[in-house]
A protein has these predicted regions:
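N-terminal [4Fe-4S]-dependent radical SAM core
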Residues: 2, 14-18, 25, 164-211
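Short beta-strand segments
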Residues: 4-7, 56, 82-87, 110-112, ...
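Short glycine/proline- and charge-enriched loop/turn segments
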Residues: 19-26, 225-230
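A short acidic, glycine-rich active-site loop
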Residues: 24-35
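Alpha-helical packing segments of well-folded alpha/beta enzyme cores
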Residues: 37, 41, 96, 244-251
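Radical SAM [4Fe-4S] cluster-binding motif and immediate context
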Residues: 182, 187-263
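Glycine-rich beta-alpha loop elements in corrinoid/cobalamin-binding modules
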Residues: 37, 44-45, 51-180
Length: 263
């Protein structure tokens, strides 16, 4: 199945909106984090046989019109769209989903990220253009949803979703966190193929840098960080040392300009 992963546009006229930041914002420094959650989900779906498309609108400071023009370069009538979100941008993200649904009424649109995970039913209530919410860590959820849609199977059997029902809304069975993170392909390979490392900036790292995950889950409950409570949980999991070193070697051999790796 064709899956279009999108980091939607938001207030492009003011700068680059860093939706992946702990506190999503357009900053004076121009900080822009890589959309790592989208990247890993796209990689996992591609690894499992699905054809992917990817648009990071903030990275190129694209507005809605420019983003929709790029999206329409592909035949997306029956595609699965996966849109990242954040609390500051949620109303704009839903409006963008509406525009996609108007273009492709037979498509299936799923919202992901911290905000819809925390407020799944409320987010679904914003618009009928949104077909589902993927709750929490969504690599496996999106892959399984794409499998079900492609085969015409009952999507209510897919774990990790919030969907509409005759009685309002229903949450399917919980999708357990991925145990073996070595199953995920290298984010750096995806960045090399689909993105440009010079579009991203992390103030604490020497520019240009690359960001990757070496683990997921955090046992702490810092009141300034939403990710353990919404995305990756409190049980720490890590990639193997060999797997991480392999990605470092890939970066060293394929990104001559990169000065630092942020983990």
């Amino acid at each position: 199945m064709e899956i279009y992963f999108i980091n939607p546009p938001f207030k492009a006229e003011f700068g680059k909106f860093s939706r992946e930041s702990r506190s999503p914002a357009i900053t004076k420094s121009g900080a822009l984090y890589y959309p790592l959650w989208l990247i890993y989900a796209a990689l996992y779906s591609e690894k499992n046989g699905h054809k992917i498309h990817f648009l990071d609108a903030p990275a190129k400071q694209l507005n809605e019109e420019q983003s929709l023009e790029i999206i329409q370069r592909n035949e997306n009538e029956h595609s699965l769209f996966v849109l990242d979100t954040s609390t500051p941008s949620i109303k704009s993200d839903v409006d963008f989903a509406k525009k996609i649904k108007q273009l492709y009424p037979k498509s299936f649109i799923t919202l992901v990220g911290t905000h819809p995970t925390a407020c799944a039913e409320e987010t679904l209530s914003y618009s009928s253009a949104v077909d589902a919410i993927a709750i929490g860590e969504y690599d496996c959820i999106i892959k399984d949803l794409a499998d079900a849609l492609e085969k015409g199977e009952n999507i209510y059997t897919v774990r990790g979703l919030c969907l509409r029902s005759d009685n309002g809304y229903v949450r399917t069975a919980i999708m357990p966190p991925m145990k073996n993170l070595d199953d995920l392909p290298y984010a750096a390979k995806f960045i090399k193929e689909y993105l440009n490392e010079k579009d991203y900036f992390f103030a604490a790292a020497t520019y240009p840098s690359i960001q990757i995950f070496t683990g997921r889950g955090c046992p702490f409950r810092c009141n300034f960080c939403v990710y353990p409570q919404t995305m990756h949980g409190h049980a720490f999991r890590s990639r193997s040392a060999e797997n991480v070193v392999g990605e470092f070697e890939y970066i060293a051999n394929n990104f001559q300009d990169v000065k630092e790796v942020v983990i």
